[in-house]
Amino acid sequence: MSRNKPVAKKFRLAKALKANSPIPIWIVLKTRGRVRYNPFRRNWRRNDLKV
């Protein structure tokens, strides 16, 4: 990908990068195990970002 990107696209890519993380352990403890994983996890090879 080119180095010079529009700023809006950079913001969208940064948001997708932050959203692609596991949930913190304290959330598992707080919800008593009802929320165990992030269903929106994305692998960079398998799934395509629509940005």
Curated annotation (Swiss-Prot):
Q: Which NCBIfam families match?
A: PRK01242.1
Taxonomic superkingdom: Archaea
PROSITE patterns registered for this protein in UniProt: RIBOSOMAL_L39E
What name does this protein carry? Large ribosomal subunit protein eL39
Q: What are its GO biological-process terms?
A: translation
Keyword annotations = Ribonucleoprotein, Ribosomal protein
Quick check: keyword Signal in the entry?
A: no
Which InterPro entries has this protein been placed in? Ribosomal_eL39 (IPR000077), Ribosomal_eL39_CS (IPR020083), Ribosomal_eL39_dom_sf (IPR023626)
Q: Can you supply one Gene Ontology CC term for this chain's record?
A: ribosome
Q: Which Pfam families match?
A: Ribosomal_L39 (PF00832)
Q: Species name for this entry?
A: Saccharolobus islandicus (strain Y.N.15.51 / Yellowstone #2) (Sulfolobus islandicus)
Annotated disulfide bonds: none
